[in-house]
Amino acid sequence: MKQSMVFSPTLREVPADAEIKSHQLLLRAGFMRQNASGIYSFLPFGLKVLHKVERIVREEMERAGAVELLMPAMQASELWQESGRWYSYGSELMRMKDRNAREFALGATHEEVITDLVRDEIKSYKKLPLTLYQIQTKFRDEQRPRFGLLRGREFLMKDAYSFHATQESLDEVYSGLYKAYSNIFARCGLNFRAVIADSGAMGGKDTHEFMVLSDVGEDTIAYSDTSDYAANIEMAPVVATYTKSDEAEKALEKVATPDQKAIEEVSAFLNIAAEKCIKSMVFKVDAKLVVVLVRGDHEVNDVKVKNVYGASVVELASHEEIKELLNCEVGSLGPIGVTGDIEIIADHAVASIVNGCSGANEEGFHYVNVNPERDFKVSQYTDLRFIQEGDQSPDGNGTILFARGIEVGHVFKLGTRYSEAMNATFLDENGKTKPLIMGCYGIGVSRTVAAIAEQFNDENGLVWPKSVAPFHVHVIPVNMKSDAQREMGENIYNSLQEQGYEVLLDDRAERAGVKFADADLFGLPVRVTVGKKADEGIVEVKVRATGESEEVKVEELQTYIANILK
């Protein structure tokens, strides 16, 4: 491709609203442009990268036995109501009405559509297992789109769905697609980890996320320093044991704590260690209000709260709800005096507190010398906190460290969550009607492009791995007015294309500095510069990833490049 014919508008300055490297560089290099908040156009070079990631995804999915189809982006609300997710999915689901006031959703995911499709066609175990996938634009009404392609409102996704007669069949396909995902991200050149995860609004169990390691990742990975254990921090169980002090219990006392609301403030004001404080939070679990307690130096894990109750939706209660429930502000919450019809659950660590501190459910006051069970009752002690660095690894090997990650893939064993709700059944080998057993498997294709850009860049621009680079080789005649340079550049361009390489020829009448700056921004694996030694049959070859350069005779160029790109 000749650069003079390509739409690739570059930017010299960093866009003000671009916070992270991938967002900045994809804009500066002219790979994409923003249309609205969280909505982007892929320009020609960006689209080539996107297509290359798609190709890798298709190759590995089909190698794993999946078959491609394409489903509609618009989905009838009746299907979502049938599955029970129309109301539980939340405000991120983009909803709309047609001119007849019929409700639809713009697809954020396709479990309902694929289950409806398969239940009408697959009636016998003889047609199972079946794995179908699509690569399609998805929509999500993000409250705060940010980080470019990493958190957008419109994005390209590969979603796959498998259907089975037995759990063993699901396990086998899940394992195969887990391997396929590992192959996909490895072929993209990414440094990633597969971690134990939460199924969230998808439902089901046994799920893993594929995380690209990056400091800008919005997820925290908890991993062992000595074993292969890794999990999303939401899902890492705490296996710590707590020993109760033999300190004698003291009389409960209410003390004034004016303007002291946060644990750190109360702890300092009362000269009590944070681990002796009881942090109280009120959650709305589906429609039920629950008081959740953790130690002052710990944080409540809302996913664990959700799992305790098997709830669809868990969110913090509003100030108004707390005021109505306990007649106090958030900074004064505590378990003492909570009426019996309001359930209190607590993390294991709370049970070991002796003569602790808690809010008094009265503005500007706290209790000291608080002792669980004596001063308040807990209906259940369980694991409710986030794991922390330094905690024992859940597998018993080593201690926990943290890393940040960008989620690019997620695989789920859905089981019969959707098939039972939507009456998707088959006849087994004994003629008995059973619900289809399902799995689902997603990859953020456009997000993967951003993750690659986030891992592969330097101070001058992008540094694409050869597997996804828009072109393999960038040929740059320095002076297009020089017949020798221009003709040699075109000859190299043509001969490399004949050898099967994708080549970009910078045939623009621009200054050398502009050409080299753009070349660094684009980040193609190999740059061939045709300069003043063209008359001698010599060019300069530079490897973008390492910065190494060498003068090479034109007749040796193809072999030299082949060794670089092998």
Curated annotation (Swiss-Prot):
Gene Ontology, cellular component aspect: cytosol
PROSITE patterns the UniProt entry points to: AA_TRNA_LIGASE_II
EC number: 6.1.1.15
Record Pfam families: HGTP_anticodon, tRNA-synt_2b, tRNA_edit
Catalytic activity field: tRNA(Pro) + L-proline + ATP = L-prolyl-tRNA(Pro) + AMP + diphosphate
Ribonucleoprotein found in the keyword field: no
Alphabetized UniProt keyword annotations: Aminoacyl-tRNA synthetase, ATP-binding, Cytoplasm, Ligase, Nucleotide-binding, Protein biosynthesis
Transmembrane segments: none
Compartments, record wording: Cytoplasm
Record-level GO BP terms: prolyl-tRNA aminoacylation
Key word Lipid biosynthesis present: no
Subunit-level organization: Homodimer.
PANTHER family for this protein: MITOCHONDRIAL RIBOSOME PROTEIN L39/PROLYL-TRNA LIGASE FAMILY MEMBER (PTHR42753), PROLINE--TRNA LIGASE (PTHR42753:SF2)
Family: Belongs to the class-II aminoacyl-tRNA synthetase family. ProS type 1 subfamily.
Domain comment as written in the entry: Consists of three domains: the N-terminal catalytic domain, the editing domain and the C-terminal anticodon-binding domain.
Known role: Catalyzes the attachment of proline to tRNA(Pro) in a two-step reaction: proline is first activated by ATP to form Pro-AMP and then transferred to the acceptor end of tRNA(Pro). As ProRS can inadvertently accommodate and process non-cognate amino acids such as alanine and cysteine, to avoid such errors it has two additional distinct editing activities against alanine. One activity is designated as 'pretransfer' editing and involves the tRNA(Pro)-independent hydrolysis of activated Ala-AMP.
UniProt-listed NCBIfam families: PRK09194.1, proS_fam_II
Protein name listed in UniProt: Proline--tRNA ligase
Organism, as annotated: Bacillus mycoides (strain KBAB4) (Bacillus weihenstephanensis)
Taxonomic lineage: Bacteria, Bacillati, Bacillota, Bacilli, Bacillales
